């Protein structure tokens, strides 16, 4: 793996003030969608798919120029209707028409369908950070909440780079307050009354 999402802010070890649940979910390997599915029914809402420039803290992880065009896919992963994760995925524009072209056709299917079903795909280490106002991920998470939590001052997020045939695709996942509330109330179980659905 020649790509790495780590930098001065994104680190492999979660920040010291993170809760045990945050440390677990920020470092948990495998498909985040599959982990969420154990908590309830997962739905994917696509909020944006477009060509854009990478964020300031993204281009180095992809080994591309700071203004090189990338394909962006942003979604909200909801569990039983509550937004649990805001996700932002990017790939070099050329790759989104080549090696990673399937990401353009996912619609409301999770990206995990591509990433965990192909033996050619490898993954970098997971890195995480606390996201504050001013970072574009903070705005993305705030929009996902539809102003339901206007007082939220920070979010916990993680990211990693997937590689296929030498070409990167980076996934950044921002955990939303409803996830932590569910884990506080129910642990890794489905909410009461939803076990049979």
UniProtKB/Swiss-Prot annotation:
UniProt-recorded name of the protein: Probable chorismate pyruvate-lyase
The enzyme's E.C. designation: 4.1.3.40
SUPFAM superfamilies xref list: Chorismate lyase-like (SSF64288)
Annotated catalysed reactions: chorismate = 4-hydroxybenzoate + pyruvate
Segments of this protein annotated with the region Disordered: 1-23
Domain of life: Bacteria
GO biological process: pyruvate biosynthetic process; ubiquinone biosynthetic process
Keyword Lyase: yes
Main location group: cytoplasm
